[in-house]
Amino acid sequence: TRAGLTNIHPERISSEHDSRIARLTGKADRVLVDAPCSGLGTLRRNPDLKYRQSPETVAKLLEQQHSILDAAAKLVKPQGRLVYATCSVLPEENEMQVERFLEEHPEYELLDCAELLAGLKIDLNTGKYLRLDSAKHQTDGFFAAVLRRR
């Protein structure tokens, strides 16, 4: 790879119902959930998006996100990490989704994104969660949480 890493085996799992989940249970060091979301963090580039989302469509997304996170959690081995990311600015899709996950999965803990980034010499000081704001960071709205399996 470009990064010079040779022990990476990416698996694109496009559904929480994928048959490979059973085979990969407890084997992944890192799992990225790029969750389907309302996309409301991209409003500056997609202003019509606000007319395509409704409380009903967001409610469906919330359940899908929950299901995907639940399935992804099974893939991570002890001390492995699960990253949950959206391009939404809605707390329901972000912090609240992660808090619900942590309540249902006591084997996981939330890592502090600001500390992780500081260790890489990136000073965003966003707190426990990585939350990018279009006004403050000159980018789309973005959210990420890093969870570690105990």
Report each predicted region and the residues it spans.
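S-adenosylmethionine
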Residues: 1-150
